[in-house]
């Protein structure tokens, strides 16, 4: 995310998802007085500078460094017909696990959580690691955790999550530069766990989650160049479930499925796919980070250590299927 520090405030430049979110929420709050924006000591996560907080008025609440209270507040507002949107950095969401489970998800209150910097390439000191949110959030019952790949998909998911009244919804905001899809995206995500096939091929299927969709595109291209394999590329969109219909379809003309996720492997998205195929002949390779605490790491070294470069992934694929 492109940001700079000015005094005690962060200034947000135009081309990042904080700015995209600010513009959307300011407009949405004017249109619908039920919408309330919440932060917990980090208003810059949503791009809410002092002038924007003043513009939002009573529809903006910063609770201070109290993520637990932020989630409980969002749950209570949602339970009473409001439309709360809570923005938080991935590294801080673990502080509110009790409230996510006991207050929000048990009651199935339709609050919205926007999780920023959920990525291996975010903050890199050991107390601010940003890649444990997928197993933490996605395994709580009733929660719907979404992983958009571009600006249009993100805004469509955000609009739907505020409009719907059935589930608590978290969105893993892309940890990339703002990317435009250049094509229409769905506006209704209520038919849960339906993945999107971005390119249909055969033999190898690449499930590239959220911010790692670009890595999936690179692997797709490199497989074609190196081995003339026209693979299938899938945008899962939903972190919290498996598209069993699509996964069953792949069995007909695929022998290998790989998953790519910008986070820790243990308890993550890829393991759901591996478990689904466990009793079949389909081979599965999961790519993500090892479960460990790392400190002041170099991102390129971390990616290489976890076989997360396109060259390494293609090498692994070809070693399995020739």
Please describe what each predicted stretch is.
Residues 9, 55-61, 82-89, 120, ...:
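Short, basic, glycine/proline-bearing loop/turn elements
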Residues 18-24, 30-55, 62, 68-71, ...:
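Thiamine diphosphate
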Residues 91-93, 148-155, 265-267:
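Active-site glycine- and acidic-residue-rich loops that bind
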Residues 80-82, 107-111, 116-164, 316:
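Conserved thiamine diphosphate
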Residues 36-38, 59, 80-91, 111-114, ...:
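A short, small-residue-rich loop immediately preceding and capping a beta-strand
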Residues 73-77, 103, 136-137, 160, ...:
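Hydrophobic/aromatic ligand-binding patch that stacks against planar heteroaromatic rings
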Residues 1-7, 12:
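Single conserved hydrophobic/aromatic residue that forms the stacking wall/gate
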Residues 60, 69-77, 82-87, 96, ...:
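Extended, hydrophobic alpha-helical segments in both membrane/secreted and soluble proteins
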């Amino acid at each position: 995310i492109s940001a700079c520090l000015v005094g005690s405030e962060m200034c947000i430049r135009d081309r990042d998802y904080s700015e995209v979110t600010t513009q959307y929420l300011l407009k949405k709050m004017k249109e619908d007085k039920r919408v309330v924006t919440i932060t917990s000591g980090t208003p810059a996560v949503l791009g809410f500078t002092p002038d924007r907080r003043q513009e939002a008025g009573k529809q903006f609440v910063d609770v201070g460094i109290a993520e637990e209270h932020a989630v409980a507040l969002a749950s209570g507002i949602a339970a009473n017909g409001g439309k709360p949107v809570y923005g938080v950095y991935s590294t801080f969401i673990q502080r509110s696990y009790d409230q996510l489970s006991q207050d929000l998800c048990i009651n199935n209150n339709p609050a919205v959580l926007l999780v920023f910097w959920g990525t291996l390439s975010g903050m890199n000191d050991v107390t601010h690691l940003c890649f444990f949110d997928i197993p933490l959030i996605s395994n709580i019952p009733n929660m719907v955790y979404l992983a958009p790949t571009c600006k249009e998909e993100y805004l469509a998911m955000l609009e739907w999550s505020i409009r719907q009244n059935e589930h608590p919804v978290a969105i893993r905001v892309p940890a990339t530069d703002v990317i435009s899809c250049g094509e229409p995206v769905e506006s209704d995500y209520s038919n849960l766990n339906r993945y999107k096939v971005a390119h249909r091929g055969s033999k190898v299927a690449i499930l590239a989650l959220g911010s790692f969709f670009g890595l999936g595109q690179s692997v797709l291209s490199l497989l074609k160049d190196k081995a003339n394999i026209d693979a299938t590329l899938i945008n899962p969109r939903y972190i919290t479930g498996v598209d069993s219909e699509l996964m069953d379809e792949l069995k007909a003309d695929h022998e290998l499925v790989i998953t790519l996720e910008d986070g820790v492997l243990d308890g993550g998205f890829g393991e759901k796919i591996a478990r689904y195929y466990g009793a079949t002949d389909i081979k599965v390779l999961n790519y993500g980070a090892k479960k460990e605490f790392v400190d002041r790491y170099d991102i390129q070294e971390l990616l290489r250590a976890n076989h997360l470069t396109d060259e390494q992934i293609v090498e692994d694929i070809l070693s399995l299927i020739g």
